Amino acid sequence: MKEQWMQKTVVVWFLAMICCLLWGSAFPCIKIGYKMFHIASADASSQLLFAGCRFFLAGVLVLLLGTSGNFKLKKTEIPMAMTLAVFQTILQYVFFYMGLAHATGVKSSIINGANSFLVIIIASLIFHQEKLTGPKILGCIIGFAGVVLVNLGGAGLDMSFHWNGEFFILISTVSAACSSAFIKKFSTKANPVLLSGWQFMMGGTVLIIMGKLMGGKFQFEGIAPMFLLLYMACISAVAYTLWSLLLKYNPPSR
């Protein structure tokens, strides 16, 4: 019954829109958070520390509120959670923050916008979770062209490609796309909500350690920054959990 309900077009569309709205609200919150926590735009180490705290808290929320108290991983599920932590949190955000300091906003948005299309390609050609048909290829081309046009906005786009800038953003995007395919694969064997919570905690812990070792730090005054951090954790917890459930019952291209 739950599977049929989660496969209804209106349900898929509605939940996917919620995910997109939550992820969209994260970007302005991140900028506000940097101001509240006194983090410079080029301070990648402090940004990693900040992201680690956010994701660790998100993992705690998912496990406490989304697993009905049964948050223990089986031995066979530990490698799954670790794999998701590597691709969905660690690689994605380490390379994103590192690359963002050396890439233009336009190029970063274009490369990051290719995520949805990379998910289809990776799920089809590498994980063989669905067939890559002509309409899907055409849809990817048209969709990516739309992303490019929207992000150009009259600004010039040079063809330069820096290994520590655009290339890092590309690695981040590919990593995020791979994580969607892994979620689809693992959700047939384990509870995606449980995996989501643990991967957030594992990935968040690694980001916190990396940020601290690189000299990251932040400071804040008052209680407002803590409420913002809690909201950002809720964004990740709700959006990624819903996305995991959608991928469990639907093909990635849908």
Describe every region a protein language model picked out.
Residues 26, 63, 67-112, 149, ...:
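Specific transmembrane alpha-helical segments of multi-pass solute transporters/efflux pumps
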Residues 30, 35-90, 118-122, 175-179, ...:
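Transmembrane alpha-helices of multi-pass small-molecule transport proteins
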Residues 32, 64-67, 94, 98, ...:
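Membrane-interface helix caps of multi-pass small-molecule transporters
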Residues 49-52, 56-60, 88, 92-93, ...:
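Specific alpha-helical transmembrane segments that line the substrate/conduction pathway
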